[in-house]
Structure formats: structure tokens, C-alpha cells
Amino acid sequence: MVAIDLGASSGRVMLASYYPGQQQLTLREVCRFTNQIKSIDGSDVWDIDAIEQSIREGLSQLDSEGIALDSIGIDSWGVDFVLLDKQGKRIGQPVYYRDSRTQGVMARAQQTLGSNAIYRRTGIQFLPFNTLYQLRALSEQQPHLLADVAHLLLIPDYLHYRLTGQLNWEYTNASTTQLLNIETGDWDSDLLAYAGVPAHWFAKPGKPGNTIGYWHSANGQQVPVVAVATHDTASAVLAAPLIDADAAYLSSGTWSLMGFESGTPLTHQQAQCSNITNEGGAEGRYRVLKNIMGLWLLQRATDELQIDDLPQLIEQAARQPACRSLINPNDSRFINPPNMCREIQNACREHQFPVPNTAAQLARCIFDSLAMLYRQVAQELATLRGRPISHLHIVGGGCQNQFLNQLCADACGLNVSMGPVEASTLGNIGSQLISLGEVADVTHYRRIVANNFPLHHLSPHDNSDFAAHWLQFQSLSQLPKELCI
């Protein structure tokens, strides 16, 4: 089986082999590539052709090795989309969700439609780049494009289409758009109308597990392409070996997404006030979670400072005084500033914290601030669910940052398990195995993951630094500019 896992910063083609008798699961990286952003006519767009080419090269490599493939699945980030004309050809380039075209659009939508009405219909967190606001911006700023559009596909649906020639709309990713009605599981006609787009661009999203079509290889293979849980976090959570019903997960990467699984969505006033999202998951479950800006801040800072040795930077940051400088990572100023280091410094200066000047000071500021925000979100989630979080499972690339994860354990006062690193890839494979009938369900698959990919564990330290600075951070996190409220 092949899992094509596309994150916001990079993509990978991974080969998985499963041996049912021993319930052994192995992964092999076929290729890894950077997901590039280009600037075209003043807009930041994804180089979707380069992404597709990298995928095809990975598949061709496996085909040339003579490996018989059972299935293929693609997962990616949410909200971004591709427009197709009546001939199935792409119209323009998919715009990057951090592009500035949506500035002010969400606030106008909340004023016109009412925040309560939008949240009640969708149960989705208010994020300025949600597809709802991207489409409203498109219809306002480039209405001439709309007449030629026949279909809108989210990124993994588009890439599945390119491999198979078949259209598909998958539920878990569709749920991120803030266009899906949480009661019906179908596109909300009133929200589509506000976005300025017709319903015939879409079909009702299907749950993960169906075969979309087939990829035909140069050597004559006809490989089923499966609609996995195509939102990367939905796949990551599918593979998270949660120890009990009260455990929470933290999918840690460019974004940090902290939440828990629920059989029903939480769309009451308290959930809305906490800006909690109810995204679709596997087996009809809901991912009740909150988006946190995550390692995006560190990625941008290290790019600007041209730092390649991340382990050394983390080691240097660990030697800095704790909580010397704090920011609110979910402040909207950090979505896509021209210069991240300068923006962090300005935020510290404005709130009378010492200004971090060195790379180590900047990194420590980011790590301490993320740990504080993790604590705040964990408390919000526990309050919403009505019982404490028993354990936190950190999955994804960020689970390799043991220093940050120890800060998270300390700040939250929780035992933490780290792994698997390739959680989205493994969740993608899990959907395929369930679809192929090789694995019974998500619970069964999580046992397989836990047995094949050992976890690492951390316990919280008695850390007075966080307690001493908690009130300072709370004052930051209550500022009205917090991300998307």
C-alpha cells in the first residue's frame, strides 16, 4: 500500500507492508519533497503541478521496482481547493491559505450571518482562511472566474482525480471548510450562497473507505485509489494509540491540533466561546479540537535566520531562562508576517517582556509560549468534556522535539506519550487496510500501530516557572486579536 502524505511544508510517498499473521506493519520512505509556495500576480499559490509530479515520480519508482501495489491513498492539509472547468481542466492555481486575500472577510461574514448561526450550522472553529471565507473573497475579488467553473475539489480530492480521472469529495477534509452542515453532512446551501458559489460545484461528501478509481501504471498495474481520511489530522488521529476514553491527542507539526474524540459534536455556546472545532473523523467520530499555531513560528524563524541544525538550537534554547519572554502563538499577527522574528520581538516589546534577540532566545520564547497555550487549551477541553484529561498523546513530526514535549507535560501537568512520528501516513494506511478488509476497525488498527511503533513517555516535572508566569500568559491570551475569534 502507498500512503501519500502532504503536510503544509513537505510531502512524502511512503510504502507500507502489512503481514496479517504476525500483525506486523512496516514503513519505507520512497521519496520526500518540499511543498513550494509561488507568488503569481500578487497571490501566494501552491505549486500543485510540482506536488503532482513528485507523487508520480514516487509511484513510478515503486512500479519500476516491480512492487505489486494493493492500494493508494492521499491525505493533505485542509481548506485549500482547486477549481475545474467543464473539461476537467484546472482554472488557475490553488491559493495558499495564508494568502492575504481573506483579510477582513471572516469579520464581515460574522457580522452579516451572525457568528452563532455559522457555528450552529457547522460546528467549525473560526479561522480566517476557512474555505467559506476564501470563496467569499474569490467571488468578491475575481467574479469573472466563476462562470467557467464546473467543480471545486479540495487538494487530496484533486490529486485523486488526477490519478484516476474520477471526481470524489471526502468527508473529513470537507468538514474543515466551514461549508458543511453538521446535521446533514452535506454542503450548507445558505453558506454556499453567501460564499457566492453554486451547489452544483459539489457532490455530497462520502465517508472514508470507498474506492474512487484506479491508477494505471506504466507496467500495467491497475491499483485501487482509496478515499482515506484525507485530512491529515483525521489520519493522524486514526493512528493515535489513545490509551483510554479520557485521553487527548496533540498532532504536532506546522500546526498543533489538540483535542479528543467524541461520538457527538459539541456546538454549544461554551464550545463556540472557546473557538473549538468539530471536524469529521473516521467511523463517524468527531475530532473535537482546537487549532494552535504550532511549529510554524519556529519554521519561519529558522528559515529567516538560516539555521539548519535544529537539534543544536533546541539544546541552546533549553539553557535559556524559562518564561523570560512570552507571546500568544494564536495571535493573528503570526499567521503570515513579513518577518516572523521581528514580529515576535515586536509582540514582546509591546507587552513589556524582554525582547529575545538571539536565535536561542527566540526559540525559547516560542517553546515556552506554546507550552503555555497547550495548558490553556487542555483546560478548555477538559471543561467542555466535563472530566479531566487522563493522558496526552503527541503524534506527528513535533513528537521528536523532546524538550518542547517535556515543557508541554510540565505546563499541562499530564503524562505524555510521544509517537508515532509518521502518524498521518499510518492513519492513511489504516484507512486502506480497513477498506481492504485486512483490519476490522480503528480500535484494532491502533493496537497494531502501538505494537509496531514503540512510544516514548514523559512525566511532568514540578515546574514553578509555569505557575509563576501563568497569569502573565493568560493576560496575553485574552487579547481580542487571538487567532480567529
Curated annotation (Swiss-Prot):
GO terms for biological process: glycerol metabolic process; rhamnose catabolic process. The gene is rhaB. Its cofactor is Mg(2+). Substrate binds at residues 78, 231-233, 291. Keywords: ATP-binding, Disulfide bond, Kinase, Magnesium, Nucleotide-binding, Rhamnose metabolism, Transferase. Pfam families: FGGY_C, FGGY_N. Gene3D superfamilies: 3.30.420.40. It comes from the Bacteria. This is Rhamnulokinase. It is an enzyme of class 2 (transferase). It catalyses: L-rhamnulose + ATP = L-rhamnulose 1-phosphate + ADP + H(+). The active site is at residue 232. GO terms for cellular component: cytosol. Involved in the catabolism of L-rhamnose (6-deoxy-L-mannose). Catalyzes the transfer of the gamma-phosphate group from ATP to the 1-hydroxyl group of L-rhamnulose to yield L-rhamnulose 1-phosphate. One of its GO terms (molecular function) is ATP binding. Its EC number is 2.7.1.5. It comes from Yersinia pestis bv. Antiqua (strain Angola). Belongs to the rhamnulokinase family. Disulfide bonds join 348-365, 408-412. ATP binds at residues 8-12, 254, 299, 397. The keyword Kinase applies. Pathway: Carbohydrate degradation; L-rhamnose degradation; glycerone phosphate from L-rhamnose: step 2/3.
